[in-house]
């Protein structure tokens, strides 16, 4: 196989929810990752909300919870803006909101969560300051981190939730980082904090006076918040910078955004976060430093960040400590895209079998700290000094539900009465006794050409024991695909 196709398959595994053979061809034919990214930015953005409303219209009275899941599947499996979707998903893992919060427990609010994600889609290739601005004025975030209707006066201090998480989780992290991602230490060897409690208290005063738009009911979540309340107009000092008195809420927010974008640690923090989510959980210092330099020189351009991550010499490096464990949502969506799973004509929405049994449905984390933290790792000597946070979403219950999803998927292969089907090329090769072709198909479509020789021989040995390619072929091919989808080599990304 041409090395360009191998590299393209690995790149798509990193920066999309899984590439089909057509996607791989598009990347190779573009001539470079830079050209391909530029082409991707021109593809119109998907809309989770639009798909949600289509499902609600096409199959009414099923409940917003089901539309929420089915419309996500429609968007990610059928959408063409594959890079934009993955970058927006990564942003959603950074700027966390969740339907699990009591404020959003009502199913009627699911559509507004879709709309929040659409905002991240719109800003996926923008400047990082635009992302901060969108999130900071989002009514979903205002409700989730409780700073909507925030007030400040002599008797009541403003709510500090958003101010704290904006610094701690979204932009700077709790400690300052060197340009290579390592923690900065003072002369005594202690970690240097990125901010103080006083910074949080002063920043909370900035986020006063923001309210929902003047509409009754849930439609208040449909538009950005407005500075219609009593904004704290007093002098403030944040991260060593003086904010003069008498500044409006909008202008003060802009000043805060610029202050954050001038913090060196922000570029390192965001760079490392994106490398962790897209390429490897344990990047080398040089990788972080090089990407961070490009991101900083671009003044926070997201497109530059993505290109720098994907074109760096470490992006396709091999070794025992490179790569990452992929989360179940990414793995399952990759399987559906790679196997070219499609709805049959006349099927109006993805069936309930894709209601995401596992607990990693987007915008559904148990808290603002997401499902895991970047430095989480299994308690095992093999991980000494390494991190692997995604292991936290592979508990026994999750693995069981993950298996159920794949069982539901492959149970419908090539059955005319079912609602979806997959690419016929795999079955054609199988029925023709083209065992090498079958394994090549799995290697190309599922493993990004990274299937080990041991796994390859295992699949060939299985096929050699399947002499009856007619009477039991459905069961035999389903067993083969199920084995591949549940294999560690498919779930991990090297």
Q: Where in this protein do the model-derived segments appear?
A:
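Amphipathic interfacial helices
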Residues: 67-68, 78-86
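Short, contiguous, well-structured surface segments enriched in hydrophobic/aromatic residues
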Residues: 81-84, 95-101
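Aromatic-acidic/polar surface patches that form glycan- and anion
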Residues: 80, 193, 473
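Tryptophan-centered motif/residue detector
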Residues: 71-74, 162, 210, 365, ...
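Active-site substrate-binding loop specific to GH73 endo-beta-N-acetylglucosaminidase modules
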Residues: 24-29, 38-43, 49-56, 61, ...
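N-terminal mature-domain "stem" immediately C-terminal to a signal peptide or N-terminal signal-anchor/transmembrane
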Residues: 1-46
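Flexible, low-complexity segments enriched for small/polar residues
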Residues: 2-3, 9-16, 57, 95, ...
